[in-house]
Amino acid sequence: MSPRTIPLILILAAAAAHADEPVGDRTGLKLVQKYNCQQCHTIDKAHGGPSFSDIAKHYASDPNARDEVAANILNGSSGAWGPLPMPPVAVSKEDLRPLVDWILSLTTT
């Protein structure tokens, strides 16, 4: 089994468990897959990088959260969540905002 398979299975299982959620949630998961985010992130457990829900909780009260998360995705970051740096990800302009909004929506998971 590929090392990528298990995180992808976890993401898809979480999506199935939330099948009644709005279409935006499915769009977020598609973007996670498109940009291979599941290689280091899952919805609710640390996996190399922080979980998406931990990221959302961290930025929950930050009025600049959208811009900061977008900048971290595009430029990468290091040291904020542990020893592994996050490389920059070439997310398209049209995908960036929906991806960031989806991540930040996960404060209740």
Where are these regions (language model features)?
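Sec-exported extracytoplasmic/periplasmic mature domains
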Residues: 33, 57-60, 74-78, 104-108
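Sec-dependent N-terminal signal peptides
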Residues: 5-14
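N-terminal secretory signal peptides that target proteins for export/translocation
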Residues: 1-3
